[in-house]
């Protein structure tokens, strides 16, 4: 039997760790830095050693209407080796915008405390991500099929899954459920507790930007947080990154300049046009953002193999005044900390950031249409090119809004 005191102990422990994590991980409002970047997912499999079983549960495509009776299979991962079958708690991870196996293998806190609290671990995949995609590939070509990608529908999926598990797993009927999540998954965990209090006794929402919406949070907050992660190491580091945008713009205007950029940064693809330069700048923006996010005080393979305090390592190359090609060479050395710390990369691919593309199609629709957050474009010490603000919805997300009309 798990007492209320034990559950409170989970929250006390988690709050302390969450506060530390928020401080170390560039703090934050977590990590929706520009029009494309979202919670990252590794391109490599995570060999965590965690043991779990994979199951599928038949879900309704539409929980709130009567016209659509279609169903899909929702994937969920279950680990019961630590569980007390006499009412031990259920720790339920509210899946993010990506493959649930990656989150399962990178949420060590849940695994660490499962043994202490004798908990059943459940990791539920979010609809339209990973393997849990209603209508398959057609979902991303037909707006009528994609219409059911909402947080409300996902929360209803989680609620139905929990009810199913508690009714079919012997000993689970009286088990208290605690929701866990980070980033968008943390938002879902918090909303899950709010919307379904009879199902979830509490939620631990790590780095969840539940207040990062218009009229609540200043739109400059995110970049200010990312900037501070670099500024703590060196003011000159921030100045050099800020100066680099105009330098890249200048080189990107000519064929010779674009060729030089490709050579200096050892890019796998040529920069043939201004659109390629824009992709290159997006890639750099995501790099600085991801570095701030994984600025842990210990070595990690979370996104890429990285040293402890990777922002500090990057800023070692950007802490002295530099101009023109000298600054470009320093930038290359800095981003190589992220992309080539092992020294095994022969070239750098601007179409990858140490994150998989499994969730990109769903998130590129979901975020601008359903989760319009204030975005940080104007902060003076920015790590993004200010010109991107003008293009944000015109070239990036505007086409998605047509789908919502």
Specify the residue positions occupied by each region the protein language model found.
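Alpha/beta-hydrolase active-site loop signature
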Residues: 98, 127-130, 210, 226
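Alpha/beta-hydrolase
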Residues: 188-365, 369, 373
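Alpha/beta-hydrolase fold nucleophile elbow
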Residues: 171-183
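Structural recognition of the beta-strand scaffold that forms the well-ordered cores
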Residues: 91-93, 121-124, 178-180, 202-205, ...
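Alpha/beta-hydrolase active-site loop
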Residues: 145-168
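Glycine-rich "HGGG/HGxG" loop immediately N-terminal to the catalytic nucleophile
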Residues: 128-144
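Small-residue-rich helix-loop
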Residues: 352-404
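Catalytic-loop region of hydrolases
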Residues: 6-120, 131
